[in-house]
Design a protein with these regions (language model features):
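N-terminal lobe/hinge region of extracytoplasmic solute-binding protein
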Residues: 37-87, 125, 132, 198
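Alpha-helical secondary-structure segments
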Residues: 116-123, 155-157, 201-202, 231-236, ...
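A structural "hinge/loop" feature
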Residues: 40-59, 79-80, 106-110, 168-178, ...
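Aromatic-rich, solvent-exposed beta-strand/loop patch
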Residues: 103, 161-179, 194-247, 272-296, ...
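Structural transition elements
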Residues: 203, 308, 341-376, 395-397
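Surface-exposed binding/hinge segments that line
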Residues: 119, 132-183, 209
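Detector for C-terminal structural segments
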Residues: 209, 213, 289, 294-297, ...
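Aromatic- and charge-enriched surface segment that lines or borders ligand/interaction sites
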Residues: 82-133, 159, 248-253, 311-312
Length: 539
């Protein structure tokens, strides 16, 4: 049954468009509808619940934050025209646009309800409020002062005060958790607010058929322009909820989806050749877009497990295992050249602070690995204990390849396949001595990866329970450093420290992969894998 949340006369042609397949349908020719699929569904349109990528993309269509990222991951104004930072780095003052209004909704007592600084205060306090249980509360927790951290100086001036300097805060304010909502809507809809978005974004919700599709239409009063032209260019968006990724791709090849993002590993060879390019039957029919993705796949070692039964308690053994991994081979044979071998640290290609000349990771070198095991007196053990590597089914083949390489030098790696939710639980509880994991940047800053090794952080993010006083000192120093060049130098020094201690084994850096219909223009991929449709056009 179709659940209509909002209704205007525009809804009927939009719904007809989704149903009609006739190429002669005049409405279909007229309306510019971008169609994509969310195989995992959308659970909420509330910004403070924007944890899953599907929710993040949806919130990005419906709401705005004070700042935003362009496709190069540079911070740009959004609801805030500009901002200033006090000399001590504690006070951020944002000057808001005065031409932004929320979409029309019955929750408001006035028409054309304008954005005010008090909306920002409410939204940020709500994000921190335990009553709302936002998974994004960490953004402000422990960073802003306890009493009145957010202040509306007047309707267009908002201030945020920190406990101590924290330069990454601007990048964090680009996260969808921090997008602005009106208090009237939250109060009016209560627990149903997740299904009644009232935002300032380029699109607005018209209908949501749970388990089937969601329909968005353009916000006619959206404030952003491009070269004097009002945004967005699209008339609407249709988001379908097909659970099977292979079926999703078939819908794309049938012309029923405007684009698809990524492919299941089992299906890659049916679409891409060994060089990561479209197979002959797809070349020319579709656009293939790639760019670095701020995601690192790695093997983690539990540094707290120092029992003699765990060979990984010895740093030399951990380093030896790092030299056993043929990262180039993994990318070539298991990934069809999608992604990049992690020959540096955890900070991936795509971040400005990534520098392969200053941070050298591990190459494939079995001879060096053997020498390290000799130094560790590993071969003198009568019955060396095996290393148990926990992973899920999706990474089984890569894990077995690592085990096979390790076996060549007498390191015994036993691969255990367990359910993803159990693996996460064991990682958090410190029950997995060796585990396959991944880390995605929450915001485009090197600190988003280095926080994995700060001893004051529990798991997550510090799943390896790494503790190093020298690293901690540099980490804390970097949080106070406003000069980017100096901050990056601190990042590089930190990377060298943990690489030497080897609490992790970086395997590869991920890559954004998008398959796009030829009539779509203006869809820029980005390293955060954020879907921004306000500048997209359909030819």
């Amino acid at each position: 049954m179709l659940k209509i949340l909002f209704y205007t006369g525009f809804l009927i042609p939009l719904l007809c468009l989704s149903a009609c397949q006739s190429p002669n349908n005049s409405t279909k020719d007229k309306l510019k509808i971008f169609k994509y699929n969310e195989h995992s569904g959308i659970t909420s349109t509330d910004p403070i619940l924007a944890k899953a990528q599907s929710n993040i993309w949806c919130v990005n269509h419906l709401y705005n934050g004070l700042v935003q990222l362009n496709h190069r991951l540079e911070i740009e104004p959004s609801l805030a025209k500009y901002w200033t930072i006090s000399s001590d780095g504690l006070l951020y003052t944002f000057y808001l646009r005065n031409d932004v209004q929320f979409i029309e909704d019955k929750c408001f007592k006035v028409k054309n309800r304008k954005l005010k600084a008090s909306d920002v205060v409410y939204s940020f306090n709500r994000l921190l409020d335990p009553a709302f249980a936002s998974p994004g509360a960490w953004i402000f927790r422990g960073k802003v002062i306890d009493k009145n951290p957010f202040v509306a100086v007047n309707d267009t001036v908002f201030q945020l005060r920190l406990i101590s300097p924290f330069p990454p805060i601007l990048s964090m304010l680009s996260m969808q958790y921090t997008y602005i909502v009106p208090q009237e809507a939250v109060s009016y809809y209560g627990r149903q607010f997740s299904y009644h978005p009232v935002g300032t974004g380029p699109f607005k919700l018209k209908a949501w058929e749970e388990g089937s599709a969601m329909y968005l239409v353009k916000n006619e009063h959206y404030f952003e322009k491009e070269n004097g032209k009002a945004l967005p260019y699209l008339d609407g968006i249709k988001i379908s909820f097909i659970a099977n990724k292979k079926s999703e791709f078939m819908e794309f090849t049938a012309g029923k989806l405007s684009f698809v993002s990524d492919l299941e590993t089992s299906y890659i060879d049916q679409v891409l050749d060994d060089n990561g390019q479209l197979l002959a039957q797809y070349k020319g029919k579709y656009q293939l877009m790639k760019c670095p993705y701020l995601k690192t796949e790695y093997i983690g070692f539990n540094m707290k497990d120092t029992s003699s039964a765990n060979p990984l308690h010895d740093k030399l053994v951990r380093k030896a295992l790092n030299y056993c991994v043929d990262r180039e081979k993994i990318i070539t044979y298991f990934r069809n050249l999608i992604g990049y071998p992690a020959t540096g640290g955890m900070i991936p290609i795509g971040l400005p602070c990534f520098d392969s000349t200053k941070v050298k990771g591990y190459s494939y070198d079995l001879e060096k690995a053997k020498q390290l095991l000799i130094q560790a007196h590993y071969y003198e053990l009568q019955r060396p204990h095996s290393i148990v590597l926990y992973t899920n089914e999706n990474y089984k083949e890569i894990a077995l390849t690592i085990a096979k390489e390790a076996d060549k030098i007498g390191l015994y790696v036993q691969v255990e396949i367990i359910e993803p939710n159990i693996l996460r639980e064991w990682m958090t509880q410190g029950k997995a001595p060796c585990f396959r994991a991944s880390w995605i940047a929450d915001y485009p800053e090197g600190e988003s990866f280095l926080c994995l090794f700060y001893s004051k952080n529990a798991a997550p993010p510090n799943y390896t329970q790494f503790h190093n006083a020298a690293f901690d000192k540099l980490y804390e120093q970097s949080l106070l450093e406003n000069n980017l060049t100096k901050r990056y130098e601190l990042y590089h020094e930190m990377e060298r420290i943990y690489l030497d201690e080897s609490p992790v084994m970086p395997i590869y850096y991920e890559e954004v992969l998008r398959f796009v219909q030829n009539n779509i223009i203006g869809l820029e991929p980005n390293a955060m894998n954020l879907l921004d449709l306000k500048r997209v056009q359909i030819k």
